[in-house]
């Protein structure tokens, strides 16, 4: 081999090393720049704290409704009586504006517990519990009426009261969210 060929190989090797080094520095710089941007898309600690709540059901008497706050919204938790459950299950689907069975709105084995988001599906008012013709909820803003299962029966509301995601941690405690 001649001296010129050795120099070309060394230059090529040196050039490859410089390209690899520059590329590595650029990649590290890009990651360091993008990491805070991507991390800022994650929910903040206060949002995560509000994403789920646990509610003790042992203080809610049969026939009573309590309101808790979840993600800034009122949530109605009702301990229904056997009569209210039977009444809700006797309703024909053809009588409902937004047909949904009572069984679909509660957790199996916990039929007495109804958990709904307390916001009228018409314009977002908060309905009053144990009011109206159907002894469920009555929206004072525009007169929508819900039965004891939170299903809309009369008025301008197009949908039933929403059921939030929830699970039973024990027989006397639920986690909403």
Curated annotation (Swiss-Prot):
It catalyses: a quinol + 2 Fe(III)-[cytochrome c](out) = a quinone + 2 Fe(II)-[cytochrome c](out) + 2 H(+)(out). It is found in: Cell membrane. It holds the Pfam family UCR_Fe-S_N. The chain crosses the membrane at residues 18-38. Keywords: 2Fe-2S, Cell membrane, Disulfide bond, Electron transport, Iron, Iron-sulfur, Membrane, Metal-binding, Translocase, Transmembrane, Transmembrane helix, Transport. The main subunits of complex b-c1 are: cytochrome b, cytochrome c1 and the Rieske protein. Belongs to the Rieske iron-sulfur protein family. The Rieske protein is a high potential 2Fe-2S protein. This is Ubiquinol-cytochrome c reductase iron-sulfur subunit. The gene is petA.
């Amino acid at each position: 081999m001649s001296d010129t060929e050795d120099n070309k190989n060394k230059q090529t090797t040196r050039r490859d090393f410089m390209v690899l080094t520059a590329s590595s520095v650029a990649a590290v710089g890009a990651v360091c720049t993008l990491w805070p941007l991507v991390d800022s898309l994650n929910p903040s600690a206060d949002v995560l704290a509000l994403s789920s709540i646990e509610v003790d059901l042992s203080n809610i008497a049969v026939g009573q409704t309590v309101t808790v706050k979840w993600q800034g919204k009122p949530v109605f938790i009702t301990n229904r009586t056997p009569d209210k459950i039977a009444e809700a299950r006797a309703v024909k689907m053809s009588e409902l504006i937004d047909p949904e069975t009572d069984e679909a709105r509660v957790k199996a084995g916990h039929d007495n517990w109804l958990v709904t988001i307390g916001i009228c599906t018409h314009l977002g008012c908060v309905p009053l519990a144990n009011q109206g013709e159907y002894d469920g909820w009555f929206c004072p803003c525009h007169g929508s009426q819900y039965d004891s299962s939170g299903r809309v029966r009369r008025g301008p509301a197009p949908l039933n009261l929403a059921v939030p995601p929830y699970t039973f941690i024990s027989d006397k405690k639920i986690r909403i969210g």
